[in-house]
Amino acid sequence: MDNQKSQFNRILLIVLAVLYVLTIAAFSYANWVVDPEYMQWWRMLLNIPLLSIPLVLLYGSIYVLVIAWREHSTLGQVSPRLAKIIHWAPRLAAILIIFFVSLFSLDVFEMEASPLELLGGFLMHNIPSIGMLVLLIFAWKRPVVGFVAFLAAAALFAIFFVRGIYSLPNLLLFVFPILLVAFLFYVDWKWLKPQPPAQVDAAA
C-alpha cells in the first residue's frame, strides 16, 4: 500500500512539474510574440521567477489537495504530517498571492507625477492586496472564514480581471490560485480534527 501511495505521489508530482514548465514556456512565448523587441532573452529569464509565484502556488496546491483527498477517501483521515502541511498551506499560499498581486502596484512609480500622486496611485493599486491581507488576518485561526472570504475574492478577481479572451491568462495568475487558497482553507476546516487539550494529571 505504501509503495502504491509513493508511486502515485511521484507520478502526480512529475505531471504537475511538466505542466508548470509548459505553462512557463507558453507565457514566455506569448509575451515574445506580442512584443519580440521588448522581450529579450534576459527579460524572459527575469520574468520566470515572477511567473513562478502564482504557478508554483497553483500546481503545489493541486498536489496537496489531491494527496489529501486520496488519503481522506481511503483512510477516512489524513496523516499527522500531511495535516501540518494542510494547516499551513492556505496561510502561506495566501501570503504568496498577496505579495504577487502587490508587485503590480510598483508600475505606478514609472509614471511622471508628484510624490503625493504616486503615493495615492500606489495605495489605490494595492487595494486588492490590502483587502486580502485583512481577510487573511481574520481567517488565520478560522479556516471557515478563509474558505468563504477567498472564495469571494476569487469571484471578484474573475469579474474585474477576466473580461475577454485576452485576459484569460489572469485565470492562471490570479483567479485559480486564490480559488485554491479557498479550497485549502476548506480542507483545513473540514478534514483536520482539532487536537484535544492536554489532560491534567490528577496526581499533579
Can you say where each PLM-predicted feature lies in the sequence?
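Juxtamembrane helix-break-helix junctions at the cytosolic face
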Residues: 5, 132-145
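Alpha-helical transmembrane segments of polytopic membrane proteins
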Residues: 12-16, 23-27, 42-57, 120-133, ...
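Juxtamembrane "helix-exit" motif on the non-cytosolic side of transmembrane helices
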Residues: 26-38, 104-113, 159-165
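Membrane-helix boundary elements
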Residues: 80-113
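Central hydrophobic cores of alpha-helical transmembrane segments
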Residues: 145-157
